[in-house]
From Swiss-Prot:
Species of origin: Draba nemorosa (Woodland whitlowgrass)
Keywords, in A-Z order: Chloroplast, Plastid, Ribonucleoprotein, Ribosomal protein
PROSITE patterns: RIBOSOMAL_L2
Lineage: Eukaryota, Viridiplantae, Streptophyta, Embryophyta, Tracheophyta
Any GO BP: mitochondrial translation
Subcellular localization, as worded in the UniProt entry: Plastid, Chloroplast
GO CC annotation: chloroplast; mitochondrial large ribosomal subunit
Major subcellular site: plastid
Protein family (similarity comment): Belongs to the universal ribosomal protein uL2 family.
A Pfam family it matches: Ribosomal_L2_C
Protein name as catalogued: Large ribosomal subunit protein uL2cz/uL2cy
Region entry Disordered, spans: 1-21, 225-254
Subunit field text: Part of the 50S ribosomal subunit.
């Protein structure tokens, strides 16, 4: 990712950074509107997820996570910004005239060719089943259910690793550190998702975060007792408890929240690292 820094004239330009060399003019037939029913609210209008609201209006980009254009070579025409994710997207022109968006693989440039199928080269951006990949391959956009499309390792900079194949399953090490089993017939894309340094980008001011739909976060220790269990006290006081809790009194910061009886319990060989 190319990050452009401005000369210091105001605090927002002094501390902020923007991406360069990325376009933002999507094709009309590959975008659609999306329905927003209250940021962070449920059907009754009650806040279920805090710190969400506002933000700039977005158009959804239709991205090809299935990569089901088999054995048809495509060429990367543009690398574009997507407001719905941290990763960039690529516009692909296929040989049969079809145009699709895919996630931008790290290192891919305009003019590169990609293809998906069963016996395709192990090359960055190509999509193929796990059974055809050698051990140690770096992959992203991984299917969990055959034919449903990629669901794992899709964020900016995400990459998983194929570490073993045995029987009908393949063993993957996911970006979170979790090691789990997936069917060898599921497909994935070779390489790492681009825009790796997005977590090092400084927004520069609070208004830039408001454009993203994120509202301010207030610490519980500076609230009143009526608003948070950590609140109250004279001056800067500790939380007054053995362990921190949520605004509703449930244990926080360290308590495991995963449900015990899940279908994937037998597929996870090692839980994700904290």
């Amino acid at each position: 990712m190319a990050i452009h820094l401005y000369k210091t004239s105001t605090p927002s330009t002094r501390n902020g950074a923007v991406d360069s060399q990325v376009k933002s003019n999507p094709r009309n037939n590959l975008i659609c509107g999306q329905h927003h029913c209250g940021k962070g609210r449920n059907a009754r209008g009650i806040i279920t997820v805090r710190h969400r609201g506002g933000g700039h209006k977005r158009l959804y980009r239709k991205i090809d996570f299935r990569r089901n254009a088999k054995d048809i070579y495509g060429r990367i025409v543009t690398i574009e910004y997507d407001p719905n994710r941290n990763a960039y997207i690529c516009l692909i022109h296929y040989g049969d005239g079809e145009k699709r968006y895919i996630l931008h693989p790290r290192g891919a440039i305009i003019g590169d060719t990609i293809v998906s199928g069963t016996e395709v080269p192990i090359k960055m951006g190509n999509a193929l089943p796990l059974t055809d990949m050698p051990l140690g391959t770096a992959i992203h956009n991984i299917e969990i259910t055959l034919g449903k499309g990629g669901q794992l390792a899709r964020a900016a900079g995400a990459v998983a690793k194929l570490i073993a194949k045995e029987g009908k399953s393949a063993t993957l090490k996911l970006p979170s550190g979790e090691v789990r089993l997936i069917s060898k017939n599921c497909s994935a894309t070779v390489g790492q998702v681009g825009n790796v340094g997005v977590n090092q980008k400084s927004l520069g001011r609070a208004g830039s975060k408001c454009w993203l739909g994120k509202r301010p976060v207030v610490r519980g220790v500076v609230m009143n007792p009526v608003d948070h269990p950590h609140g109250g006290g004279e001056g800067r006081a500790p939380i007054g408890r053995k362990k921190p809790v949520t605004p509703w009194g449930y244990p926080a910061l360290g308590r495991r929240t995963r449900k015990r009886k899940k279908y994937s319990e037998t597929l996870i060989l090692r839980r994700r690292s904290k």
